[in-house]
């Protein structure tokens, strides 16, 4: 909503920076080291696109030296890359994601405490185990996400289905789906670990049958593919005869 497009998003997967030797790739290798002529993967992107959203995914996997770099960025709003150029982060929005505490959210809430309160307390406790106090103190807000509900998952399923529309429209085909189909897809999927499993159900229900029908010549331009739900509440693909 900030930029109305995903283009300004700079996503950094912290699983690629678990080792000490990989940390220098963020701001570039120092003089005399391999890769000195190459720009830092973080600093160069921000230098070229100063108005960006920077996402550090799964921050708990990063090497401690990465935290030192981030601490300087959060504290001063800028950092020097390996070429000696000052990169300004004052116009960026920095987000960090973490799975801290996600494996220990099944305890009883107790009297007078909601599930969200308990979840936030466990998440904060887990964050404090790998983030230093001075780092946490420079974070503006810590947001704890609640488990996805039925309505949330149906909206996500709709977005996933919409991704198929441009490809089908390029072949002259139209995709339609009903609200009952969205509910059926969610009910057919095990969403205990989030919404990623929805894509498997959609692939099995929509993508594979439509691809087979196109290859077999049963679908031609001007036809409509409809995803609905049968009498048992299962997702059902209706192909034109």
Functional labels for PLM-detected ranges:
Residues 1-241:
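AAA+ P-loop NTPase nucleotide-binding core of proteostasis motors
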